[in-house]
Amino acid sequence: MNENHYLLLTPGPLTTTKSVKEVMLYDWCTWDDEYNTMVQEVRAKLVSLATKEEEKYTTVLMQGSGTFSVEAVIGSVIPANGKLLVCTNGAYGKRIVQMAEMLQIDVVISQTEEWEPTNIVEVEKLLQEDKEITHIAVVHCETTTGIINPIVDVCKLGQQYGKVTIVDAMSSFGGIEIDIADLQIDFLISSANKCIQGVPGFGFVIAKRDELLKCKGQGRSLSLDLYDQWETMEKQNGKWRFTSPTHVVHAFYQALLELEKEGGVRARYNRYYNNQKLLVNRMGEIGFKPLVDKKYQSPIITSFIYPKEGFEFQQLYNELKRYGFVIYPGKISKVDTFRIGNIGDVHEEDINRLVDCIAKGAVIG
């Protein structure tokens, strides 16, 4: 039984280990050399998780939610005369479009249904037709539904057509193996409170050094200037430009150590995959069908279609919370769904307990 009051079956914030929580019981100074050395270690560890070609990449940590880091990239990487192609099939792709529009960046959209992956044929057609496109952005795991998008194919097109590639790997990095050098990803974005299993408070950008250097002077925001943030961390040994979330950084460092102890990203992926497979099998036994086709389904979060007309999600939510579980409502408009996350400090025995509770007739009518 997990020691938390509630087991969060969500895509982040998520259930963390007791040891991750415990390191936040102490106070830390942002100017302390030991703390800044830890920041540098975190940055280096993230690059080593992302690629074998570590010398080509660097990490920028950015205060705030993961969305802050996405906006830092969109607002800093694309020049005034640039044009962004966004692949969208959910809320987080749409959010990138909204950012670009608010920042007055020219944007082209390749949109598919929320339960369908990015259409590679359409993406290539847009690249062929619009020579002004300079950058491509795609969400790896769209947690609106739990679908995985074909970033390998998107990045191949980016390389083929000479575009800068931006991958929002918010809910996949650390839980699904990615080598950003092999894929020729220029900017990868994620967050502390996802598959690394830290707590909310900062996001991070793993950037190709050559591309990051081109961003100098392009920032459209003071606090979200990606280049300036990186330059300060580089020149001042891990110093953040503005107050950093010291407790969150320590928790994240501990979470990185625990990821290594678990056996790395592949071992964590296997646990998440087994959680998700068990969840779908057991939920199927009691009448719940997943929204996303299994060939596109991530191990991160699963959307389930309401089992019958008149099903009340709030009843399910309240009952599960009474049993110590917290799940997510659906986030799409065309199909009634709810979502169950498979990541965090969650194990097969937790999934079995969850479905046992759902199987009790009170929560499904």
Curated annotation (Swiss-Prot):
Gene3D superfamilies: Aspartate Aminotransferase, domain 1, Type I PLP-dependent aspartate aminotransferase-like (Major domain). InterPro entries: Aminotrans_V_dom (IPR000192), NH2EtPonate_pyrv_transaminase (IPR012703), PyrdxlP-dep_Trfase (IPR015424), PyrdxlP-dep_Trfase_major (IPR015421), PyrdxlP-dep_Trfase_small (IPR015422), SP_NH2Trfase/AEP_transaminase (IPR024169). The keyword Transferase applies. Its cofactor is pyridoxal 5'-phosphate. GO terms for molecular function: 2-aminoethylphosphonate-pyruvate transaminase activity. It holds the Pfam family Aminotran_5. GO terms for biological process: organic phosphonate catabolic process. Signal peptide: none annotated. Keywords: Aminotransferase, Pyridoxal phosphate, Pyruvate, Transferase. Its EC number is 2.6.1.37. The modification N6-(pyridoxal phosphate)lysine is found at K194. It catalyses: (2-aminoethyl)phosphonate + pyruvate = phosphonoacetaldehyde + L-alanine. Belongs to the class-V pyridoxal-phosphate-dependent aminotransferase family. PhnW subfamily. Involved in phosphonate degradation. HAMAP family: PhnW_aminotrans_5. Homodimer. This is 2-aminoethylphosphonate--pyruvate transaminase. It comes from Bacillus cereus (strain ATCC 14579 / DSM 31 / CCUG 7414 / JCM 2152 / NBRC 15305 / NCIMB 9373 / NCTC 2599 / NRRL B-3711). The gene is phnW.
